[in-house]
Each structure stands twice: as structure tokens, then as C-alpha cells.
């Protein structure tokens, strides 16, 4: 049985540089090949016409260029509605599956992408953590989610493409920092075709303090969102087990340093859960926590998940909570839920699908 060749896309830039050197080629070839893969999206080495035939043959002898398989596609609402949420289930090289979501609106096309297969953090209100953790995604597996969504957009909106990216899919992005960073650098590279400004990219974390510090020093110009969900240490630990390792006091100090360093506000994401974090006292604690650094608050509703007993709050409770924050002079928004009917909303991604797999040409 013939051994399957390695997927060249899985190599980091440093690993690709070393592979090219091992072939006896000059370093500048690395950039050329990388551009063919991630800017021109070459499917074969034969397409790389600016590279010698000899090198193309060498590459073809050692590597292949692989793509994720579209295993399922679900749309929230009518297939003819250009603004309905879409969820893609992608099958990776090792047969693991991830989900990525397109959230269209009149002014933007947002890609919600995953950073890991599953999630190790097991947040109590999130389906991704209940599936278990398999592995980190490579940089190309992150990038290919964006490209897959872009391909889908072109079947519905000929002149549109992804305008924003949020790392709010499966996994904790800051636990996969190197691959996260490389994927962002590729997607924002001004010499590549996609070329999305980093300010259009948001990284969401539950508050991994070493990762926040690393992000602050990385030179990336992305936005940062913190999945806070409670400003009570006890309540937060009951919802987010890893919060026991990173106290709210530590997190507040880290975010104060981060915003001072970057000059940019962070977004505090707060999912309202009936009877758990929705009281006047909870609102007071949230206001107190947010006064220490530059931030805005984004409230979201709970999206139902099978086998979880949480419930969304009543509108009256939500209005009271919002008013308390506004009275304190703090900017607050309420995020509209997208894709709940296809389990594509916040906290619902669990890499489940039903449709037969097909190749990328059918995206």
C-alpha cells in the first residue's frame, strides 16, 4: 500500500523554510511557494508556474496539497435569504471534524472560526467543551475555514467576501497561540490576495492570562474579547472551571496592562443565565470589574443546548441588567443571536453533521 504524502500546507513557515533548504533551494523559494498555496490557492504543484519544473517535481515527490472536505452545510432559514446564517462542517486530513460559521449582514460578512478540534476547558454552558479535546488546529486548517466560507459566499453573493473574522468557534484560541498568530499573519498579509486588516479580526478568550500577555507582546493589531460571564469569582468558576487558575483579580490587572499597552478597549462578553448571573448584585459586580480598564460590555442571550439545564433570562430581567450598566456610564450592547436553529449560535458548536461528504469544488 502506497504511503500517503504529507500535506505541505500543514508546515509552519519555519518548517517550510527548512523543507525547501533540505531540497537544496534558496530561501526566497519559501515565500514563492507559500504565496502559491495561500494567496493563489494552488491545488497542485503544476500550477506554480513561477517555479522551475525541477523543483515542482521535487515537491510533488514529497508532498501533496490537501484541502478540507465539506461534510455538511446547514443554513438558518431560507436558502434564498442572503442574510441567513450558514454553518459548515469540515472534515480534516485525519478525519476529525470542525465547524465554522458565516454570519452575513447588510454591511459585513463575518466568519466565526474554530481554533481547536473540541475544547479542553469544558465551560458548563458550551457544547464544544462537552465533546472533549482532540488537538490544536494547524494554521492552514484555520485559514481554510475562512477560504471555505468565502467560497460559499461567492455562490450567493458574487461581489462579496469575508469582511470580519471572530475566533469564537470551537476551542480556546490562546491555547493554540503560535498557529493562531501565523494564521492571522497570513490572512492579513498585504501582499496576499485575501489581505484582511487585523483590526477586522477579534480573538475571544475565557481569560488565559499567559496568552493575553503573549498577545499583547506579539505585535498583532487584532481586537480582544473576554468571555467573562460573571464578575463573581465563585459563580465564574462554576461556569468556567479554568477560572480557578486565573482569578478575577489577576484578570483585571492583566487587562489593565493590556489596554494600557495597546491603547485599545477589550470587549467583555457576558451571557445572561436565568437565576445564575442576572441579579442586580451581578450587574453591580460587573460594573465594578469593568471600571479598571478600557472596555465595553457585550451581553448575549443563552442559546439552548441538549442536556444542559440553563435557561435564558426574561426580557424584563435583561432590561434591568442593561439599565444598571448604563446608569454607571458604561457602554453596553446586546448581541443578536444568529443560527440557533442550526446549532450555530454562541456555545452550540459541536462538530456534528449528517450530509454526505463532498470535495471543495462543491462548496
Swiss-Prot record:
Gene3D superfamilies xrefs: 1.10.150.530, Aldolase class I
EC number: 2.1.1.192
Cofactor(s), by name: [4Fe-4S] cluster
Listed GO CC annotations: cytoplasm
Entry binding sites for [4Fe-4S] cluster: 119, 123, 126
Sorted UniProt keywords: 4Fe-4S, Cytoplasm, Disulfide bond, Iron, Iron-sulfur, Metal-binding, Methyltransferase, rRNA processing, S-adenosyl-L-methionine, Transferase, tRNA processing
Disulfide bonds: 112-346
Top-rank lineage group of the source organism: Bacteria
GO MF terms, alphabetically ordered: 4 iron, 4 sulfur cluster binding; metal ion binding; rRNA (adenine(2503)-C2-)-methyltransferase activity; rRNA binding; tRNA (adenine(37)-C2)-methyltransferase activity; tRNA binding
Domain Radical SAM core intervals: 105-341
Binding-site positions, S-adenosyl-L-methionine: 171-172, 204, 227-229, 303
Entry's localization field: Cytoplasm
Record's function text: Specifically methylates position 2 of adenine 2503 in 23S rRNA and position 2 of adenine 37 in tRNAs.
HAMAP family registered for this protein in UniProt: RNA_methyltr_RlmN
Similarity field: Belongs to the radical SAM superfamily. RlmN family.
UniProt xrefs under PANTHER family: 23S RRNA METHYLTRANSFERASE, RADICAL SAM CORE DOMAIN-CONTAINING PROTEIN
Note: Reaction proceeds by a ping-pong mechanism involving intermediate methylation of a conserved cysteine residue.
Protein name: Probable dual-specificity RNA methyltransferase RlmN
Lineage: Bacteria, Pseudomonadati, Chlorobiota, Chlorobiia, Chlorobiales
Encoding gene (name): rlmN
